[in-house]
Amino acid sequence: MTDVTIKTLAAERQTSVERLVQQFADAGIRKSADDSVSAKEKQTLIDHLNQKNSGPDKLTLQRKTRSTLNIPGTGGKSKSVQIEVRKKRTFVKRDPQEAERLAAEEQAQREAEEQARREAEESAKREAQQKAEREAAEQAKREAAEQAKREAAEKDKVSNQQDDMTKNAQAEKARREQEAAELKRKAEEEARRKLEEEARRVAEEARRMAEENKWTDNAEPTEDSSDYHVTTSQHARQAEDESDREVEGGRGRGRNAKAARPKKGNKHAESKADREEARAAVRGGKGGKRKGSSLQQGFQKPAQAVNRDVVIGETITVGELANKMAVKGSQVIKAMMKLGAMATINQVIDQETAQLVAEEMGHKVILRRENELEEAVMSDRDTGAAAEPRAPVVTIMGHVDHGKTSLLDYIRSTKVASGEAGGITQHIGAYHVETENGMITFLDTPGHAAFTSMRARGAQATDIVVLVVAADDGVMPQTIEAIQHAKAAQVPVVVAVNKIDKPEADPDRVKNELSQYGILPEEWGGESQFVHVSAKAGTGIDELLDAILLQAEVLELKAVRKGMASGAVIESFLDKGRGPVATVLVREGTLHKGDIVLCGFEYGRVRAMRNELGQEVLEAGPSIPVEILGLSGVPAAGDEVTVVRDEKKAREVALYRQGKFREVKLARQQKSKLENMFANMTEGEVHEVNIVLKADVQGSVEAISDSLLKLSTDEVKVKIIGSGVGGITETDATLAAASNAILVGFNVRADASARKVIEAESLDLRYYSVIYNLIDEVKAAMSGMLSPELKQQIIGLAEVRDVFKSPKFGAIAGCMVTEGVVKRHNPIRVLRDNVVIYEGELESLRRFKDDVNEVRNGMECGIGVKNYNDVRTGDVIEVFEIIEIQRTIA
């Protein structure tokens, strides 16, 4: 091969002349651009380039893994996402010379570390020895100085004590020397311990590095030739091997993985925290550092029960009580069962029960008053100071039709009784009358048995009770009830013996009958005034008013006239044009138009006030009855009326009262349900009469509801589905249609929209104006639901004279009818010696071989008894029939 120049060779290799000259220079050959190159020089350059570019053997592996991930989406649907993981790994085979060089470097590093460890040990030993010597010298100096001070102080003492002091000094010196020696020994032990710890630490580090080197040395000859590591770093190799184990773990979780997994039943298995710590140690933390311990928070069960302060309101659920005591709800339920109370976790229990349960479980109970807001509102009132005399509030009570309203009518000189349906009073009327001797406020209560609660309210709101008794009728049931209400309210009674102008009047009989109930006239040594009156003729009215005023003067009735008013609701109703209307009797203070009132569950601002004559008034003082407008709803009769300052607080108190009433009602219902559980399980099918009741005033609704509910029996129950004040609306009709109920209107009518629903649904709508008729018709409806009573009536007796055998019917009794008539296919009884021995049915009845339907008294016949052949001569066959008797509600 001929020689070529550098330029030609550069053109052939497609490189620059300068680069080629530099490559020749690196190979140890000096050339210029115009020099020629021999074949030997070319080979030298090629060998140099090959040696320079040669590297370790490499092997690159690529892997793809595909999986599907379900991602939850909106609407409960899941979405599948395809995931592909790509991994690439390169394994490098090192040159043996390179491995030797690395081993030499590591050996040198180990020797250097060992030398450093030895030097550190020697240095620490020297430092500890020097420190111990210094401390001993300092201790000796301090002791010598202290000894010199003590010797100088002791020179002035008596000579006979010097010997003792010398001995003590020698003993003290010996003790100090012993302490110094002990201190030196402890210092040497401390230094030795530190040296041992340092040596152990260095040895542990050396052992760990040796294990790493061993792992590196053993990896190449023992592993498969394809399992190469990319780097020589120990930590990188650990991370790489860990990733390999994670990838292969899914496939290799077979027998080995199951065998390595600890069994559940193994009592000696390590705890979860130990397993987590070991797992963390195997993985290694960031940078290859091992975690010392698990970061999970540990919790240990308290060694003893924790007693807590449990705050309990008026009502609380079982679950809330359990949370306050930090126990499970099941434990509270168990504690209640031990106390004899059944409960569920969501049941509302009262304060007393919750207190018993909490104290039984060892906790301290703090009872919380939930009516603090109500008390604050009630206390923030300007009630004035000076009390002035006020008019008496007189309630007229007595039996129905004894002339109460007629008596009051004569006093007021108006015709009130004619306006009452049926001539009986059906709600409380409140009136005040001006007389020559002062003003009197009258409350007229119903006398019918249904209005018990009204009479009770009238007695509670009154100062004096006028008991009206008809002279011709005497004491009646409602008269006795009125006496009981008056005694319960502790108010004096003035007896008005009415209808004294009738010929059959007997006032002495009235006195005798009333004396049996503790009402004694003054002439008999009692405290009650008896006045003979006639509401029709007007006799004795002035004497009655004088007796009332005299009794009021004895009572010394006083009230605060100035300030914020308070009173009671006598009656309430819903007016179609004016909304909720309440008749209020003011007890204290003065009620003004525009005042903010709180009335039971309702509140509002007084928009208008009217007296009993329908006249607008701006204010009402004590003992004055007025109608007020502007409440948020119809209050219950008997509720307290209070004037407050803030309408917002009044609303909060009203809403609180509603919620409290609902909670207490639910708790009471739940308790009764659980207590009557077994009784309800045993009772059979009960018919129900559903009623939707609407009336003109609240008192009538209450009285009618009570009367109807009292009609319920074990077989027929009266259920008031809905009740209210005002006309019958479309909502009431819809409710009645849904519950299959009877619509009852008492002094009210249905509006146009309600009538359409009633016609479309064919509902049973009934109007009443007298409570007698309403109760009687509901009784009739309930009677129709009663199952009839079955009664057995004997219609004939036949005496057996002889017995014949029949191939078709068996034994045939030849009988003589002694009483009544014997009918075919009627039930019979066979009596022997007046004892019933068989009860069955008469199957065959013949007379002279002819089948007949009946045989009358005094005739002979043949009787075949169904499924009975033991008929004997002398037996008596009793024929009877079953009749149904319709029962009625008493």
UniProtKB/Swiss-Prot annotation:
Question: Which stretches does UniProt call biased (Basic and acidic residues)?
Answer: 92-217, 267-280
Phylogenetic lineage: Bacteria, Pseudomonadati, Pseudomonadota, Gammaproteobacteria, Enterobacterales
Read off the Pfam families from this record.
EF-G_D2 (PF22042), GTP_EFTU (PF00009), GTP_EFTU_D2 (PF03144), IF-2 (PF11987), IF2_assoc (PF08364), IF2_N (PF04760)
Q: Where is this region: G1?
A: 398-405
What residue spans carry the Polar residues bias annotation?
67-81
- Give GO MF terms, alphabetically: GTP binding; GTPase activity; guanosine tetraphosphate binding; translation initiation factor activity
**Protein name per the record:** Translation initiation factor IF-2
| Claim: Nucleotide-binding is one of the keywords in the record | yes
Which organism is this entry from? Answer: Shigella boydii serotype 18 (strain CDC 3083-94 / BS512)
HAMAP family cross-referenced by the UniProt entry:
IF_2_B
Q: Which GO terms describe its cellular component?
A: cytosol
Question: Which residues fall in a compositionally biased region of kind Basic residues?
Answer: 252-266
- The family this protein is said to belong to: Belongs to the TRAFAC class translation factor GTPase superfamily. Classic translation factor GTPase family. IF-2 subfamily.
Where is the segment annotated G5?
Answer: 534-536
Question: This protein's superkingdom?
Answer: Bacteria
The entry's keywords: Acetylation, Cytoplasm, GTP-binding, Initiation factor, Nucleotide-binding, Protein biosynthesis
Q: Which InterPro entries match?
A: DNA-bd_dom_put_sf, EF-G-like_DII, EFTu-like_2, IF2_assoc_dom_bac, IF2_II, IF2_N, P-loop_NTPase, Small_GTP-bd
Described by its record, this protein's role is as follows:
One of the essential components for the initiation of protein synthesis. Protects formylmethionyl-tRNA from spontaneous hydrolysis and promotes its binding to the 30S ribosomal subunits. Also involved in the hydrolysis of GTP during the formation of the 70S ribosomal complex.
